[in-house]
């Protein structure tokens, strides 16, 4: 497995994984060509030093997973840094092969390199398998999350 920063050329593979997700098929637009909004978002993420959009390639060079890390400076924890993990996706035909565990081992090491004191994520309640996975690798459901769609 190779972990690397995503490039613009990876966007079709990333968006396809997101669109094939339980909820993604309801809100994403995986089309050829991709809507320009995805490329605009990529440019914004890529230009922000506190964001890392990553992909994982298999030995054949195929993108089999992706995730995004946001490093957030806080005043709490004596000015600590949190790592927010978002958009975790493993290609459907690659689930159950240990990619998720390798991904989170890599994420935790990267967070330590950046001086992070806390790694956090959210998972939709409609994804019970993902929730079990996160609990199985040590994450704890410690807070109630709230969202307001605009």
Please describe what each predicted stretch is.
Residues 55, 62-71, 89:
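Conserved beta-strand in the GNAT
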Residues 87-90, 96-109, 136:
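Conserved acetyl-CoA-binding loop-helix of GNAT-fold acetyltransferases
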Residues 101, 125-143, 148:
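Conserved active-site alpha-helix within GNAT-family acetyltransferase domains
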